[in-house]
Amino acid sequence: MRPFIDDAKRRAERRLSASRQSISARRMFASSFPDRLKVDADDAQMDYTAPPSSNDSRDGMQYMQQSVMSLIAAVGSRTDLRARFDDSSDSEEETRTRPRFLSEKPFDQQITASPRADVTLHVPSAPETRSSSRERGRRHRRSISEHKLFRPFKAGSASQDKKQDASPDPGPSTSDRLSPIPVLPRPRSATPRAAPILSRMVEARALLETENPEENPQTLEEKEQGVSKKSQVSPLSRQLMEMFRFPTPEKVVVEYACSLLQSMLLQGYMYVTEGHICFYAYLPRQSTRVIKSGYIYKRGRKNPKYNRYWFSLKEDVLSYYADPSNLYFPSGQIDLRYGISASLTEPKDKSRESRDFQVTTDHRTYYFRADSSVNAKEWVRALQKVIFRTHNEGESIKVAFPIENILDVEESPMVEFAQTFKIRVVESEETYAIDEHYFTFFDPDSGRRAFDLLKGLISGTPTRSPPGLSPLPDHTAQPRRSRGSQNRWSLTSGSKSQVVSTRRQRSASTSILGSGTGNENSPQRQEDSSSSFFNSIDQVTESSAVLQSITDTTESASQILNRSDVFQSPTIHTWQQRTSGTARSNRRHSDEITRSTTEHGLDGISLARDGPEMQYTNSDSEQESKDASRLYSAVALNEIVKAGTYPLQRAAGLAGYLKSRSKEMSNLLATESMGYIEKVSGMWAGGRRHYGETDGLLPDDRALYPETAEESLRDRERFRAHFALPPTEKLEAAYFAYLHRALPLYGKIYISQNRLCFRSLLPGTRTKMILPLHDIENVEKEKGFQFGYHGLVVVIRGHEELFFEFNAADARDDCAVTLHQRLESAKFLVESISLSQQETDESEAAKVEHRMLQEARRNASAEQDLRPGLSESSELHSIFDDPRASIVNFKPAEPLKITCLTIGSRGDVQPYIALCKGLLAEGHKPKIATHAEFEPWVRKHGIDFAPVDGDPAELMRLCVENGMFTYSFLKEATAKFRGWIDDLLSSAWRACQDSDLLIESPSAMAGIHIAEALRIPYFRGFTMPWSRTRAYPHAFAVPESRLGGAYNYITYVMFENVFWRAIAGQVNRWRMKELGLRATNLDKMQPNKVPFLYNFSPSVVPPPLDFPDWVRITGYWFLSESSDWTPPRALAEFIQCARQDGKKIVYIGFGSIVVSDPSALTRTVVESVQKADVRCILSKGWSARLGDPTSTKVEIPLPPEIHQIQSAPHDWLFSQIDAAAHHGGAGTTGASLRAGVPTIIKPFFGDQFFFGNRVEDLGVGICMKKLNVSVFSRALWTATHDERMIVRAKQLGERIRSEDGVATAIQAIYRDLEYATTLTRQRSSISSTPFSPTPSTKTSDDQNANDDIADIEDWTFIGDESDLEFPRRARERAVSGADNIPERTILGSRSIYADS
């Protein structure tokens, strides 16, 4: 191994002068070794584990991958930058804090605190060294106490809140340092009656009023009377009063679980009180979950042809991809935050259901076509739901209307298997509007009772006089729809809610929508929302055109619309406020209709269209002023003008749109032409730019930052517009570089808080990349593909590596360090990465409100008719949409005889013992077929055993001395192992008799043929990647440097062909002689279609995106053997002594490998342990097997720092140490990672190189290419002192321990059992093979060949061309030869076929 710090540092120092070093260079080498480890020893280039014949070579033995690399290209070394950045950058400090919602503080203690300052979401404070400018720029954090749920019921609270928000923030407030509100667990008692939480809230409010008498000057008597009154009502009534802002608590008559039927079913609860009918639904955010995905067709913008894409609906963005396995490179995106509607398209043939649908946004309409009408409806519903959510802030829906406003209730059967009725309600006394609310009950009895109850309430309500016209009051306008309106839809928002002191009898909910979520980085939107009315006269026609297009959509689509920028009139701009610095910088802002808001003292006017005429409706407001009267007079004048010009509005809107946009474009070209030229020249010149804080930077480094704040904000807005990112995504740095895929593509790299993005800049290219930082495992520097360029490799979880090239080394190094810093910061962010602090507060407030309502329901009186709830949230779940679900029981009705066939070392057998123990618990009869020396170990666990020929030690010696499957390996194996392979095949055939299911390690070579002869399902299970993928290279062909997805994929194809050609002759002879099968080849066997079970953790080797469905990474199959094992006294005393001395303990063991010079290896271990100043538990294991007999003894005296053991269970031993160093076998690597300790791997052969790279990529260990004192001592010191590595290893260990690999594997077997059976029968029918010569009891001999033909039609494979040819030839052969099945004669274990 190269000295990974000193070499990198020397190279960096040669590139950077002492007078000027970049930020990345100053922070790159923050951690350093002790002085004793900085100097290389004489053996720095030696490798004491290499065979003697290869010590003279530069890199030791020649493996197969090295010969492949010499044919492709030789690339340079890379520098390990992981865990070398102790100091965080300024940009990192801004985003390291994360909201914490869990607290150890009891809930009642937090509620009783002051709701004005004490109840809040805790956000860890930034370091005290943060600059004052950053404090001034920090976004104000609103506490939960400002949410309406926690406000004291005092007059003027809203105005006080406004004053408080207007005052400057001198520093961290008291609320920023207090504990958050924890999530309450459900009580575990048998009774549903929980503790009276609401009563504690009453006490809290009483305590608040006594502590703050100036805010509520009430007498003590009044307070006591208020508390006594509140104590007389139920907690549910008080909670509903707070949620819906009733003036007094109203007795809850009845409660029902039902759904509000709009464009989608909103599951929630209906509460019938003495005066109101209320509905509440909780809609939690699920921003990181893919809502819906699948193949649909999309029509081009100019090309009417429909092209098939893979679509993914996630968060607020609908993305489509040409390749579903390449989800980081979208072909396009549709930002649904600016969506208007989603609806089915009317089919031309009325007799057929439509498969076409469309999505309308504020700038164009997208047309789609699904495979079926059902799929189209599902997509429309999902899109409508997202649009509905994006148009309404908050996470809960509240609807409330007075009972006296109800006109009638009538049944309306709309949903099958459900009771649905319609409630018609008068909106208010000021209008003639009548609203219709549809409620669906999936319990018919509850629906009938609710219907009868509401009918009875209406009959007992005095008749109302029809509402008449009234003058326009001073109130905030709300849009109206055909069914329901915005002022009846209240989605709880975390921003300030305006508390209404005077109530009218309205059908709307009293909870008013707060102001929209602001964007601190968007001066354009702030200016739009705070401008005045006077420059909106030119643009009103444009808004009317938009409204006209909206109202022309279908009714179901219009019901989900609630956006203020669409339905309310344009707000007012003054030309003086419009400056060049706040000009619209992208299409979204130029096309977006300005929003209206009430937080700046202006009331918007909404337009409502009823038939062919336009009319204005208004809602409540609290203040009157001269400014408001002037505003309404201007509105009245505008009404007269609009009434006469409405027929021409759409044409005028189009003309005004073109005119305004033409002016803006001409002004842009006139004023920005020189800037455009400068940008283009700067683009080709390359470079980099940072967007963090500039305090404390050197003058030379300030040149990397934008000159003005406006420029920085404009760049961030453009970045978000390019990639359809949320307003909270903050750009950190940008670089110009080449992205290498098929060809180098020039473009721009963007690094933000949570994502790494790339956008091509070449004309005619539209490549975009959006890569979440949590999917990045590592970043490494490489040499560039082009001369004079510098490479950067991004290692992605479950995906092939990405290659970037920079024209300057400084830019490449800066990008690498910035990415490492962002990766470190991203680990501490919450999973919902797209939520701002305000949105997070709103989410938590909604959760608290929902939780308190659930507590109040449980505390409700038993006399109330409480029905079981539908669900905790209003999310609609599809049936059986998760492949991991357990709705259907796949377990066979009868127990199976299962044989596990494997060869190799102890680590190859141990996972199958664990799997067989799980199968035993399921009632099956497992058997392990392997080498005879493992029989006592297998039978000790109660598992049947069958012997297989072969000596694992001899095979291991061959692998170590020649490398895995190199030319020398194949040459010696051909000369010495031909007889061994024949014996292996024959013994495996005997061992697998009388089996119903076969699970085999593919290294055994015989299983797929045996399953074909026995006509039984066949699975493969292995400890290393064996299936074709672009994400990882074949475990036996790991290159020294990253070579990309194409190389990775070809290693599997090449290995399959080389491996098969080496054994094909012997296997085909064995098939014909013993199995009675015809000769075969790779096309007929289709090994890449076999169900595969990988027994390693998906946290260690994430499933690649291009794995097929039948390939599953189940998790480690661990075998716990420490329960009945007692450690020797000497070992226990050694561990205790090391802990008392304060020394780190490491485990060093190279089991299952063979070395030619055990003495030199032992000496290297001793000197490395002493130099690193650690304590060592040494396990020799198989290190000297087949070597000199004297090597079984200790060659040199071991110092007291080292304690040698013969063997110990890994699960016990690794829990006692601080780091582990071993050969990197799959089982040992899994055990050390499961224990959560840093792992040092010195690979010798096979998959050990693969797992060594994985450990390095995950940042949980070190992979050593060579083993000597210099390298090993540094690795031991790093593994025991690097905090980043230690923390990562602990986190990975927790994830692995939470997995149950055996249970997952058994469920996967059950699910794919039928598929595996069909696949085996297909291969058998091709070989013209009837049932096995020794058929199992589950198979009947009288089954004819017609079953085989039917089986062939059950499965359709999509893959390579050669794979597609096989099913076709199979069907042709089966049809033509169904009546010509050869007869069979059984002689012992050999089947002789007569020619047909």
UniProtKB/Swiss-Prot annotation:
It is found in: Cytoplasm; Preautophagosomal structure membrane. SUPFAM superfamilies: PH domain-like (SSF50729), UDP-Glycosyltransferase/glycogen phosphorylase (SSF53756). The GRAM and PH domains are required for the localization of ATG26 to the preautophagosomal structure (PAS) and are involved in autophagy. This is Sterol 3-beta-glucosyltransferase. One of its GO terms (cellular component) is phagophore assembly site membrane. InterPro entries: ATG26_PH_GRAM1, ATG26_PH_GRAM2, EryCIII-like_C, Glycosyltransferase_28, GlycoTrans_28_N, GRAM, PH-like_dom_sf, PH_domain. Belongs to the glycosyltransferase 28 family. Residues 186-196, 1324-1343 have a biased composition (Low complexity). Keywords: Autophagy, Cytoplasm, Glycosyltransferase, Lipid biosynthesis, Lipid metabolism, Membrane, Protein transport, Repeat, Steroid biosynthesis, Steroid metabolism, Sterol biosynthesis, Sterol metabolism, Transferase, Transport. It is a peripheral membrane protein. GO terms for molecular function: sterol 3-beta-glucosyltransferase activity; UDP-glycosyltransferase activity. One of its GO terms (biological process) is lipid glycosylation. It catalyses: a sterol + UDP-alpha-D-glucose = a sterol 3-beta-D-glucoside + UDP + H(+); ergosterol + UDP-alpha-D-glucose = ergosteryl 3-beta-D-glucoside + UDP + H(+). Residues 484-532, 571-584 have a biased composition (Polar residues). Residues 1-21, 40-64, 83-196, 209-232, 460-532, 571-627, 1324-1346 are annotated as: Disordered. Residues 238-273, 717-783 form the GRAM domain. SMART domains: GRAM, PH. UDP-alpha-D-glucose binds at S905, R906, D908, A1208, H1210, H1223, G1227, T1228, D1247, Q1248. Sterol glycosyltransferase responsible for the glycosylation of ergosterol to form ergosterol-glucoside. Its EC number is 2.4.1.-, 2.4.1.173. Residues 1-16, 94-107, 588-602 have a biased composition (Basic and acidic residues). Pfam families: EryCIII-like_C (PF06722), Glyco_transf_28 (PF03033), GRAM (PF02893), PH (PF00169). Disulfide bonds: none annotated. PANTHER family: STEROL 3-BETA-GLUCOSYLTRANSFERASE.
